[in-house]
Design a protein with these regions (language model features):
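Active-site-facing alpha/beta catalytic cores
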Residues: 1-112, 155, 163-164
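Non-transmembrane, aqueous-exposed alpha-helical and coiled segments at domain scale
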Residues: 89, 104-108, 113-138, 142-172
């Protein structure tokens, strides 16, 4: 940054801003290469990001991605689509957060505006009854993808907002 004339002396917010990174832990050889043991705690951390997440297609309870993330101490996210069940979420929580730590597991809903109200309420009710410490969040872009006439993937803003609104309505 100094080459651009930006330093902590003339831009103090550079040292004041907390920046956290997250990405999908899709390529396991990449993640493994960046995994280290913390010298103080002896715990394993994936140093490629602060929080790692797995997607709908890599969240199988016996999949390599779930196994890998169960072995690191980073906060973890897991995307859940309309085909998921409460039992799926409960099993994932047991494997990814066996100590039921606050802040460890983030379930990321990506069901789509037309499906969230049919599926999330029952999942939420059953999972909450287990007393699991889960952060619930939403990725309203993923479940609302459509193909435009030119073949590009896009989203209708009204559908994105509808899913967000439904997500909060269901939680309250």
């Amino acid at each position: 940054m100094e080459a651009c004339g930006v330093t902590t002396a003339n831009t103090p917010t550079l040292s004041e801003t907390k920046l956290y990174t997250s990405h999908e832990a899709l390529l396991l050889p990449y993640e493994e290469a960046l995994t280290r043991v913390d010298s103080l705690s002896g715990d394993w951390y994936d140093c490629s990001a602060h929080m790692l997440w797995i997607g709908e297609r890599t969240r199988g309870i016996d999949d390599a991605h779930v196994h890998f993330l169960s072995g690191v101490k980073n906060p973890i996210g897991c995307k859940i689509g309309p085909n998921a069940t409460a039992e799926d979420v409960i099993k994932l929580a047991a494997k990814l957060n066996p100590q039921n730590e606050n802040g460890r597991l983030n379930i990321i809903i990506r069901m789509g505006a037309d499906k969230i109200e049919n599926y999330l309420p029952n999942i939420l009710k059953d999972v909450k009854s287990e007393g699991l410490n889960i952060l619930w969040s939403i990725d309203p872009m993923h479940g609302n993808t459509v193909k435009a006439s030119n073949g590009y993937k896009t989203r209708e803003f009204d559908n994105v907002m509808k899913e967000v609104k439904s997500f909060f309505d269901i939680h309250h």
